Amino acid sequence: MFAHWKASLGFAVLLMIAGDASAQSPHVYTLSGDVAFTHDPSITKDGKTWYVFATGKTPEGGQFAIRCSDDLEHWKRCGQVFDAIPDWIQKRSPGTKDLWAPDVSYENHEYRMYYAYSLFGKNTSGIALGVNKTLDPTSPDFKWVDKGLVLESKAEDNFNAIDPNFIRDHKGQDWLVFGSFWDGIKMRRLDKSTGLLSSTDTTLYSLARRAQPPDAAPAPPGLPPNWEAIEAPFIVFHGGYYYLFTSWDLCCRGLKSTYKTVVGRAKVVTGPYVDETGKPLLEGGGTPLLVANSRWLGPGGESIWMGPKDEDLIVFHAYDAKTGRPSMQLSTIDWTGDWPHAGLEP
């Protein structure tokens, strides 16, 4: 999610707020405490405590800052995942300085974190797995153990193995969805016991991609073309459908960030996914969910918590239109009309 370009959209489009279509406004939390510089937040819960994991290097020199809260509003720093980038990643991807896009879930009596490594603008990337018995940093059992490589992409591949998201379908099968630029969002089946790739189903499923405009500009030297900008996939199951959330356009450029979050849905986890108008996501479809307002730019890098009684949450980052600084934001999801609606802080 760190690396991404795109030709600018018209500013008027960026000022749309997709949640306006909802008959019942979602609740947008007013956050305080340590919420700045929280890229690609992944939210989960252990006991009564909420935890958010974020991309990148920590002030202490480690990787993946952890923030925690008891009420979803007041947040503090409560540790980091790794003290340093694992040696095997440094050997496999020399020059890697940050680890990206953590995705944390609780499966098979352990917390699993899928995460990515890469270099800016390249698809020589990989997705790895770390596990922990607890998220409580005060517990004697607290220790993140790196399980190594899950999936990688090479320069000759048409996909980019970053931005992982774990999903267990309603039949109990585990999947890993991922992708950034190139040919878009992909999916592989996982082995349920190990969390690694399935050896019985090696299919690389295609879920979503951007459509090439007729006036597309040539790709910058050594970089993918701007029109390919789709990444940060996240899938949830709701009301008989799988909903695929992705981030489009430009991330991580402060006041020039043009990220926005879009969504489509399918009856089967492997697709085909369509947007609210029926346009396939493999043909560039996507219904806007989060787009900029006058105060916050580039909302994206989302993760979702599906709670009891439809108490569902979406967490993401956005950029302060005054300072260009990124910050974490949090909204409930309103499912009016069987499509999600969420909001930004005013």
Please report, for each region that a protein language model flagged, where it lies by residue:
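Bacterial N-terminal signal peptides that target proteins for export
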Residues: 1-9
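Compositionally biased, low-complexity segments
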Residues: 4, 18-21
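Carbohydrate-active catalytic/glycan-binding domains of CAZyme proteins
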Residues: 23-346
